[in-house]
Amino acid sequence: MKSTKTQPSPEREREPSFFQKLFGNLCSCFQDASIDEKPTYTPAKPVKKAPSVVQPRRVSRTLRSSESVHTNHGPERVFESPTPARTSISLESAISPNGTTNEQDIAQQGDMIDSHVHFGEQPTEPIDFADPPLPEVKRYGEGNWLLPPIAKEDEGKKCLILDLDETLVHSSFKYIEPADFVVSIEIDGLQHDVRVVKRPGVDEFLKKMGDMFEIVVFTASLAKYADPVLDMLDHSHVIRHRLFREACCNYEGNFVKDLSQLGRNLEDSIIIDNSPSSYIFHPSHAVPISSWFNDMHDMELIDLIPFLEHLARVPDVSTVLNLQL
């Protein structure tokens, strides 16, 4: 009996190759679409090149942070807000309304504070303390700038503005082990210890940045807390100026750091801050960084060094940092 071979029907499509199948699967995954019996192959769209090596990370963080914006109101807050989505703690929350303290109250409040700092939980019954009057901000020159004229040794350098809390350090009123150092501050006539942990790489970061930039620490924390912390942190004496809460603008309940008030050229000004609401006036001059609490494997400060070395040489930092969302 003579064997016959079945001829493929002219209407039948050619079986796709392995690479065609793989490409089709990838396309369907990215497009969130299921593959039919006759898959359709869509060519990949050209991707616009990111303007900097950290641009993808900057975009994702900005989008995540923009989902919620923190406000700064209520009782006095000694620390700066730990993250955009969380309200900062108050050291006064461990002091009873009549100005007295006891160990049990402090322990209970300490538990609440630690939970509040790390998880953004609001106290169920917040204690109402009036904010103290902030000191008058010292101004310089005819423009009433926040900073004095640039020093001779910093001429030709760009200005690097650094946030403090959750950017360079994490501070807690509750016991932290191990703490890098402890500062004592006075609240209503009583001394309270604040334990401070340094972000990994902060010493190397500050030393290298001091060679390339005029460094300014600009924090929304109170000076009575931030000043002693910076005294302990700045081993290399590279921080030229310190600005505190009174130098911030209060815009819709947020402490905003207005770079146009510093007295430095904007094209030469860069701010690194974990809170996007701090730089809402100048987002194209910002390098976002994640909020840091206790991850000792964090390397973001070290990772930023080569990028900032490049940024120190560009004519206008906004041409690199400007996000095209």
From Swiss-Prot:
Region (Disordered): 37-85
Keywords, alphabetical: Phosphoprotein
Protein name: Uncharacterized protein C2F7.02c
Membrane-spanning intervals of the chain: none
Phosphoprotein keyword on record: yes
Pfam family, one: NIF
Domain FCP1 homology: 153-311
Organism: Schizosaccharomyces pombe (strain 972 / ATCC 24843) (Fission yeast)
A GO molecular function held by the record: RNA polymerase II CTD heptapeptide repeat S5 phosphatase activity
Any one cellular-component term (Gene Ontology): plasma membrane
Entry-annotated residues carrying Phosphoserine: S52
Residue ranges, compositional bias (Polar residues): 62-71
